[in-house]
From Swiss-Prot:
Organism: Haemophilus ducreyi (strain 35000HP / ATCC 700724)
GO biological process: quorum sensing
Protein name from the UniProt record: S-ribosylhomocysteine lyase
Purpose of the protein: Involved in the synthesis of autoinducer 2 (AI-2) which is secreted by bacteria and is used to communicate both the cell density and the metabolic potential of the environment. The regulation of gene expression in response to changes in cell density is called quorum sensing. Catalyzes the transformation of S-ribosylhomocysteine (RHC) to homocysteine (HC) and 4,5-dihydroxy-2,3-pentadione (DPD).
Binding residues for Fe cation: 54, 58, 129
Pfam families: LuxS
Record's keyword annotation contains Metal-binding: yes
The protein's assembly and partners: Homodimer.
Cofactor mode of binding and number, as noted: Binds 1 Fe cation per subunit.
Reactions the enzyme catalyzes: S-(5-deoxy-D-ribos-5-yl)-L-homocysteine = (S)-4,5-dihydroxypentane-2,3-dione + L-homocysteine
InterPro entries on file: LuxS_sf, Metalloenz_LuxS/M16, S-ribosylhomocysteinase
NCBIfam families per the UniProt record, alphabetical: PRK02260.1-2
Principal EC category: lyase
Gene: luxS
Length: 169
């Protein structure tokens, strides 16, 4: 089985909250797709609650689009990581890591200031959500407060890449 790109970086050296360009792909038609690792928590040290990350998933995707989409950038998807330490964001275009960090910061502000009640969580119903009873706005707010308190940095692949010899052991 091929080794996925996300497992070629040293998770013990990752900063969080932080943005990292995980991968860039040029499609056969010439479109550039960029995948970002949006790391909310330090791997193996912190974790987002299941209910908090689920609520954040419903809110974060929309607010990130509000702040990052443009005539040069269009978010395809933002999905939570199985390890519950962050999200992957795939988009058309190549915004700078700093532009992504700024959008992320603004999205966290929006979560705290624009969503004060669970009735304001988009798609929170049995028809549009696979586990609509598994949410916590309180946890999502705490995650947003933590991100804003810590600040968002940039993780560079060259600082995190695992040694080929170690990978091939």
């Amino acid at each position: 089985m091929p080794l996925l790109d996300s497992f070629k970086v040293d998770h013990t050296r990752m900063n969080a909250p932080a943005v990292r360009v995980a991968k860039t792909i040029t499609t056969p038609k010439g479109d550039l797709i960029t995948v970002f690792d949006l790391r909310f928590c330090r791997p193996n040290m912190e974790i987002m609650s299941s209910k908090g990350i689920h609520t954040l998933e419903h809110l974060y995707a929309g607010f990130m689009r509000d702040h990052l989409n443009s005539d040069k950038v269009e978010i395809i998807d933002i999905s939570p990581m199985g390890c519950r330490t962050g999200f992957y964001m795939s988009l058309i275009g190549e915004p700078s890591a700093q532009a992504v960090a700024n959008a992320w910061k603004n999205a966290m502000h929006d979560i705290l200031t624009k969503v004060s009640d669970v009735t304001q969580i988009p798609e929170l119903n049995i028809y549009q959500c696979g586990t609509f009873s598994e949410h916590s706005l309180e946890d999502a707010h705490q995650i947003a407060r933590d991100v804003l308190a810590k600040g968002i940095s940039v993780n560079l692949n060259e600082d995190l890449t695992l040694d080929e010899e170690w990978l091939n052991r």
